[in-house]
Amino acid sequence: MRLVFMGTPDFAVPTLEAIVAAGHEVALVVTRPDRPRGRGQKPQPSPVKEAALRLGLPVDHPACLDNEFVQKLKDLGVEAGVVVAFGRILPPRLLDAFPQRWINVHASLLPKYRGAAPIHRAVIDGEKETGITTMLMSEGLDEGDMLLKRSLAIGPDDTTGQVHDALAELGARLLVETLAAMEAGRLQPQPQDGSQASYAPMLARADEQVDWSAPAEAVHNRVRGMNPWPGAFTMDEGKILKILRGRLRHEGLPLPDPTGSAAHPGEILQIVGDEVAVATGAGVYWLSEVRPAGGKTMTAGAYARGRRIGPGFRFG
């Protein structure tokens, strides 16, 4: 099948590679323009553009998806389009030019977690399962008819980064399967049940901050949900402290009692080796790895000793 592929971040790269490996002809790869990155802020290509150039595929990053762009796709003999985390909404003129031939790879089990941040939100919410849905694109936000689904278990300590990588590979396999079914005429699109829909909006700064009054499990979910990016944080006397890793239990040690009158949410209960036990609204959370503002990543124990803080000190 002759395709146009539209995607931008590293999540989309395995799908592009799988399409090529499956023998499909990619007439054009469309991605976002080069953007300044790194210390030097030099323009850098998107991960999808890097992959496309490595694969010898033509690349475009049009400023506008207008009628001229639509005609370009028609002139290229495009039969269908694949969209994976492109970062732009496709206008009706583009959808109408190839009706029922735009396939989107979405990182959730639709209709749950429609929107821009389905992986982060699923981990933060403590979901035990997520997955990939391929769907026909529509004008609504992730509202198109579903084609195929595959689920993925989320372990209790899995981070967003780990789930992201697993879903990227799963999405690549499912998209190839979807294209094969489309060519064979076996697809049976299923409408989504809007009454069961939930949304995964883009992350805001407030989403990153740990709420110590929440139960320990919710704190843990937020920390792993923000790993590796953008990173959960707490405040240490007015300064940001990133919390990169932690856990709910410290094997071989009696559980500190956070219910005493002196224990407040965010208060350090004890320091054991590399880890720091902190009281929450219900239970104890062990900080394992942190990074102070402008500093390097270190163990929580090393940070506490360097700061000369201990039991009784309270994070905000």
UniProtKB/Swiss-Prot annotation:
Gene Ontology cellular component annotations, sorted alphabetically: cytosol
One Pfam family, short name: Formyl_trans_C
InterPro entries: Fmt, Formyl_trans_C, Formyl_transf_N, Formyl_transf_N_sf, Formyl_transferase-like_C_sf, GART_AS, Met-tRNA-FMT_C, Met-tRNA-FMT_N
Catalytic activity line of the entry: L-methionyl-tRNA(fMet) + (6R)-10-formyltetrahydrofolate = N-formyl-L-methionyl-tRNA(fMet) + (6S)-5,6,7,8-tetrahydrofolate + H(+)
Gene3D superfamilies documented for this protein: 3.40.50.12230
Annotated keywords: Protein biosynthesis, Transferase
Residue stretches in coiled coil: none
Xref: CDD domains: FMT_core_Met-tRNA-FMT_N, Met_tRNA_FMT_C
UniProt GO MF annotations: methionyl-tRNA formyltransferase activity
Annotated (6S)-5,6,7,8-tetrahydrofolate binding sites: 108-111
SUPFAM superfamilies recorded: FMT C-terminal domain-like, Formyltransferase
Enzyme Commission code(s) on record: 2.1.2.9
Taxonomic superkingdom: Bacteria
Function: Attaches a formyl group to the free amino group of methionyl-tRNA(fMet). The formyl group appears to play a dual role in the initiator identity of N-formylmethionyl-tRNA by promoting its recognition by IF2 and preventing the misappropriation of this tRNA by the elongation apparatus.
Family designation: Belongs to the Fmt family.
Protein name: Methionyl-tRNA formyltransferase
Name of the gene: fmt
